Curated annotation (Swiss-Prot), chains A, B:
This is tRNA(Met) cytidine acetate ligase. One of its GO terms (biological process) is tRNA modification. It comes from the Bacteria. Keywords: ATP-binding, Cytoplasm, Ligase, Nucleotide-binding, RNA-binding, tRNA processing, tRNA-binding.
């Protein structure tokens, strides 16, 4: 039986994700972001709710990406997630994409020319953002055309790159329905962005998400629930450059902007530049919010839930890797757990996220 | 003409304070806490409002105590404040007290025996709180009876101690009306505690404070407006012992208590012990809130306001000391100004507290 790995955020889980899981083959392992996501913001609902939605709709195992993998630029995000899936025994990597490309060929090229490609990046002008640089790299070495540039496209290329040398079969799955950033509501498969935007429109949420009740009943948050805390952090710390990825330049920009703004979006607008993209600034604000430091990744893999079929696989994996299924006095990953504590501050109904919580078990035939 | 110095918090200003100012002689200089007060909490209204109330009711000059003088145990508070008043040319120190004691004699004893008295403190058991120790010290060396122990009594003794060797005439003024901590409303002169407690009772506030409208119209805060920020600080910082007066023991106690409490008062209750008094814990929480460090005191004296009579005196003083009347790009005291920024976070209507603000001028005949 194939073991398919899928990297996901499910922010929130919707019919597009369900379709992706249906297209994937064999046992399906999802490596999912925890309570903070790649674009640098809190997830709309907590990791347990999102894991349960996934398990009720096709996933067999959901494991958690540590904070410092989940909140990273595309390359680090993909690398960290693919490493975990590979450790978990995946032989196939399935991912959504808007483009019909030969990703295996792209991975092969990267495997062959990784050094030249990395060297090429170094030669590019520093006025370009990192995404712009990688785009130029792919264009030069593979001839890909970025005219239809989309976030999933960039992520898919990052997966190809991350799986180079890993003996993983790549299975791109063409996305159905709305594009990633679409805020349109009138589509069969609404995007996660549209659902977050219209989360208070119950009818729309019921139409566009399976297991909708889980989503609707969970405490929902967005960046603005954390604005006061971020502002306080920036104002109260004389130095900010102990925080991961904060340099003196960005610290100064944040310190002078913070006294004039009233929301995270205003702050991001004021601080972002061509080189400091909005996504990068949002990630930096997330690092500041949770006071992130440069840290080692945890050794164990934290399991959020599984089906019976998934449980069989976990039993086998336990012999060779460290599976963390319940976090007690010894932390799994201090950084992620601190981030979770702070995530809880965004809404008084968010439950304890780690200590003593057991994986979700979905009883169904494998 | 006598120049009388008065140490005050005016939290808020009431008829008892007005009486004290009336009893004082000559030019009246008040050294007042800024936005955080000695017992370790945010002042109910900002320093500008409190200074204006004082200037409208008898004070000639109001200068600001730097944060690290204002939020300190009685001895350091008194010492820092008396030093500033002495620098400002005060020859008399007036203060309220419940006890008719010969404070000049007490100051004389301290002047003579300071070393023995300090050595005596060292011999006392560490299970005693600092206030308990100083109480024993005064009992042993001066025979004072502490049966009617009150905060003002302790402060008055601290003033006596602080003025030792300073050539300051001590003028104790017997308090009228309610005792310091009284929460009773039915008294001619209500205590500041009672007024804070019943701040939403407009009739009571009008009865017990002069210049009531200033108080009633100002944005009012209390500790609970800052609970979310303190909780966030404790949760997000792996180490707390970089904060002034936070040691490993108190840091651990705070870290384990914070996940179980829902208010500052609950937190103080959980963390305080016989040795860590509630006042000390509140001060520590204030240090954490504003991220205070051990710092040097500022050189200049920050003037919050003056009458015409006060202005004459300031002109003379300017020749020998640094008077800061407007804070621009160069900070007066970074710690105080950071504390003020954070004070502002407690209520969205609190105005900028430092940058570009000029002293209050009250036009009246000297």
């Amino acid at each position: 039986m194939a073991v398919t790995g899928i990297v996901a955020e499910f922010n929130p889980f919707h019919y597009g994700h369900k379709y992706l899981l249906e297209q994937a083959e064999g046992l399906k392992i999802v490596a999912m972001s925890g309570n903070f996501v790649q674009r640098g913001e809190p997830a709309i609902v907590d990791k347990w709710t999102r894991a349960q939605m996934a398990l009720e709709n096709g996933a067999d195992i959901v494991v958690e990406l540590p904070f410092q993998v989940a909140v990273q630029s595309a390359d680090y995000f993909a690398q960290g997630a693919v490493d975990i899936l590979s450790t978990m025994g995946a032989d196939t990597l399935a991912f959504g994409t808007e483009e019909d490309l030969d990703y295996s060929e792209i991975a092969r090229i990267y495997e062959e020319k990784a050094e030249q490609m990395t060297a090429f990046l170094e030669t590019l002008d520093d006025s370009l953002s990192y995404p712009q640089k990688t785009q130029k790299m792919w264009e030069s070495f593979t001839g890909i055309d970025f005219s239809g540039n989309t976030p999933n496209h960039i992520l898919a290329l990052a997966y190809a790159k991350a799986s180079a040398g890993k003996n993983l079969r790549l299975q791109p799955i063409k996305r159905q329905g709305a594009a990633y950033h679409s805020q349109e509501k009138n589509q069969m498969m609404a995007s996660a962005t549209a659902i977050r935007k219209h989360i208070s429109d119950r009818t729309f949420v019921l139409q566009s998400t399976p297991s909708s009740e889980l989503l609707l009943m969970a405490p929902q948050v967005n960046w603005e629930n954390y604005f006061d805390l971020v502002r306080y952090h920036i104002l109260s710390q004389e130095q900010l450059d102990h925080v991961f990825q904060v340099n003196q330049e960005i610290a100064n920009r944040l310190k002078s902007a913070i006294v004039h703004v009233h929301s995270i979006e205003e702050l991001v607008d004021k601080v972002s530049t061509k080189r400091y993209t909005k996504a990068r600034v949002r990630r930096i604000l997330t690092y500041i919010l949770v006071n992130a430091r440069e840290n080692n990744l945890p050794n164990g893999v934290h399991v959020l839930g599984f089906t019976e079929k998934g449980q069989e696989h976990l039993k086998k994996m336990k012999k060779s890797i460290s599976i963390v299924s319940r976090i007690g006095a010894v932390p799994w990953d201090q950084q992620t757990q601190t981030a979770d504590r702070i995530y809880q501050l965004g809404h008084s109904d968010i439950k304890e996220q780690n200590f003593g919580r057991s994986p979700i078990r979905i009883e169904k035939l494998g």
